[in-house]
Every structure is written in C-alpha cells, then in structure tokens.
C-alpha cells in the first residue's frame, strides 16, 4: 500500500495536490493520511482527487469527537492516526508510542509540531510528516511517504522543493528531513564551559 502522509496544511491544499499528482505518475497512491489542521482540507482533497483520505481533527479544528484519532488498516498491520496534541508530542513521543501499542498498531502518524520526524521505537514506526505550508524547522515544507507490504514497512520524509525538482527523485536520507543548524546562546556556553572541569 502506498500512503501519502500530510499534516497541518492550514487551508492550503495546493502542495498536496502537486505531490499527489507527481506520485501517482509513478504508481497509484492508495490513500492520503491527513493528520489534522484542517479537517476541511482533508475532505476537500478527497472530493477533488477522488482518492480515499483518512483524516483526524487537529487542535485548530475545534472540539473533541470520535475523529480525534483513528486506525488505518494495511497489509503490514494497523497504523494509528492522530494529530498529536492530546498525546503531548511537543514534549515526547512516548505517549503516542504507548497509544499505538495499546491499539495493536505497528505505527503511528501524527502532526501538530510542524516539524518532520521519522523514527522507530521497538519496531513501532512513528512518522510526523511536518507541515507543507507552515514548517517550523526551516525545511520549506515536508511530507511523508509510507509503502507497506505483508512483511515490510518503508518510510521517508521528503522536502517539498527537493521532491518537486525536475530530477523527480527528491533527496534527503531515509526517515528524516534535514535538521536546521543548532543555535546556542549563553546557557549553552555555560553548560559547555562547565563540562571542562
């Protein structure tokens, strides 16, 4: 199964449409996962593209409901879909990891932070596709791609500009977007200085 994973589009669906059309030329996208903010974007994408969009509400979609999280069934196993704000993903991935385990999932898709990440914790895949329209990591916008088989899960985070470049292959290493340069200040200098004793 070929799964396009996006989150935090905040009303701008154009990049998702561009990516979907390019991916579909290679082989059909089976499902788009939208991890919230905005749920209306997910519904509009499904209507416009004619592909199933599995979606959940985000913190900007208002209220609590049965669409705060859901399960996507694949041949490799189930994936939890959630926005991540209720699992406090800003601070740690532990809560989302445990929620995936509690629901017998092999992985979890989430958003909220606007920062892409792809990790595995004890063979549980955790993917945050970041945000295509409002990234907070200096990436210029990111999305995720997951391909599942009966005994396999392959995943990668792509930068939008790299993926849409004429070469068509995108760049970046498996499972992660390039990280911004770390900036430090006075506290960092103090901590580094204290390590010298």
Where would I find each of the regions flagged by the language model?
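N-terminal active-site segment of His-dependent metallophosphoesterases
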Residues: 1-48, 62, 67-68, 139-142, ...
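Conserved beta-sheet core of the metallophosphoesterase superfamily
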Residues: 54, 85, 89-154
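Glycine/small-residue-rich loop that forms an oxyanion/phosphate-binding "nest" at active or ligand-binding sites
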Residues: 43, 48, 54-60, 66-85, ...
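Core dinuclear metal-dependent hydrolase active-site scaffold
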Residues: 3-5, 73-74, 80-81, 145-146
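Short, well-ordered coil/turn elements that cap or connect secondary structure elements
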Residues: 27, 48-50, 74-76, 121, ...
């Amino acid at each position: 199964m070929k799964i396009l994973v996006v989150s935090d589009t905040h009303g701008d669906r154009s990049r998702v449409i561009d990516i979907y059309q390019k991916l579909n030329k290679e082989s059909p996208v089976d499902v788009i996962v939208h991890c919230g903010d905005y749920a209306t974007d997910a519904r509009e994408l499904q209507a416009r593209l004619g592909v199933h969009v599995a979606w959940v509400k985000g913190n900007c979609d208002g209220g609590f409901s049965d669409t705060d999280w859901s399960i996507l069934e694949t041949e490799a196993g189930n994936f939890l879909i959630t926005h991540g704000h209720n699992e406090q993903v800003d601070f740690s991935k532990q809560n989302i990891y445990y929620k995936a385990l509690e629901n017998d999932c092999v992985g979890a898709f989430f958003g909220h932070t606007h920062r892409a990440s792809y990790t595995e914790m004890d063979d549980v895949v955790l993917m945050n596709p970041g945000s295509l329209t409002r990234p907070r990591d200096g990436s210029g916008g990111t999305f995720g791609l997951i391909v599942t088989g009966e005994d396999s899960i392959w995943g990668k985070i792509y930068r939008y500009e790299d993926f849409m470049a004429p070469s068509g292959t995108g760049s970046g290493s498996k499972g992660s977007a390039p990280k911004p340069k770390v900036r430090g200040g006075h506290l960092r200098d103090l901590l580094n200085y204290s390590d010298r004793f």
